[in-house]
């Protein structure tokens, strides 16, 4: 059963400006493994990666029902599987979590769906 759905749209230029203004911005958003992957990228791909991870973590917090205040950015990790598909590899939810990340020229759109076993009950 679906526990929560979260969506987010983030402006790539806003994330790029934040990273340019504060070089520690990526460190605050990304887990060590995500950061290592990010540091292998440059230019537009780096901006897309950072923006996508930020937006997906925002979507996750919405699906979880808490917002970013209760779920730290470091509590959620999104890596790519062998086919390049983003997957949630670390998160506080005990059920299954699914993520989708899509980019346009100027925006990133993300969606997270959380599923759990058992009767429908909103215990947030």
UniProtKB/Swiss-Prot annotation:
Cystine connections: none
> Does this UniProt record's set of keywords contain Plastid?
no
Statement: the UniProt record of this protein carries the keyword RNA-binding: no
Q: Which domain of life is it from?
A: Bacteria
Q: Which UniProt keywords apply?
A: Cytoplasm, Fatty acid biosynthesis, Fatty acid metabolism, Lipid biosynthesis, Lipid metabolism, Magnesium, Metal-binding, Transferase
Q: Which GO terms describe its biological process?
A: fatty acid biosynthetic process
Q: So where does Mg(2+) get bound?
A: 8, 58
Name the catalysed reactions.
apo-[ACP] + CoA = holo-[ACP] + adenosine 3',5'-bisphosphate + H(+)
One GO CC annotation, please? cytoplasm
Q: Which GO terms describe its molecular function?
A: holo-[acyl-carrier-protein] synthase activity; magnesium ion binding
Primary localisation category: cytoplasm
So what EC number does this one have?
Answer: 2.7.8.7
The record's section on InterPro entries has: 4-PPantetheinyl_Trfase_dom (IPR008278), 4-PPantetheinyl_Trfase_dom_sf (IPR037143), ACPS (IPR002582), Ppantetheine-prot_Trfase_dom (IPR004568)
User: Which cofactors, if any, are listed as required?
Assistant: Mg(2+)
Q: Where in the cell is it found?
A: Cytoplasm
Q: What does this protein do?
A: Transfers the 4'-phosphopantetheine moiety from coenzyme A to a Ser of acyl-carrier-protein.
Family in the record? Belongs to the P-Pant transferase superfamily. AcpS family.
Check the record and name the NCBIfam families matching this protein: acpS (TIGR00516), pantethn_trn (TIGR00556)
Q: What is this protein called?
A: Holo-[acyl-carrier-protein] synthase
* Protein source organism: Lacticaseibacillus paracasei (strain ATCC 334 / BCRC 17002 / CCUG 31169 / CIP 107868 / KCTC 3260 / NRRL B-441) (Lactobacillus paracasei)
Q: What gene is this protein translated from? A: acpS
């Amino acid at each position: 059963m679906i526990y929560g759905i979260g969506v987010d749209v983030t402006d790539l230029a806003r994330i790029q400006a934040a990273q340019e203004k504060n070089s520690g911005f990526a460190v605050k958003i990304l887990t060590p493994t995500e950061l290592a992957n990010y540091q292998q990228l440059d230019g537009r791909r780096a901006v897309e990666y950072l923006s996508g991870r930020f937006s997906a973590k925002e979507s996750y917090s919405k699906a979880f029902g808490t917002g970013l205040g209760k779920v730290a950015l470091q509590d959620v990790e999104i890596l790519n599987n062998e086919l390049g598909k983003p997957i949630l590899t670390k998160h506080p939810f005990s059920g299954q979590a699914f993520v989708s990340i899509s980019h346009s020229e100027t925006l990133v759109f993300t969606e997270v769906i959380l599923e759990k076993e058992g009767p429908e009950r909103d215990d947030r």
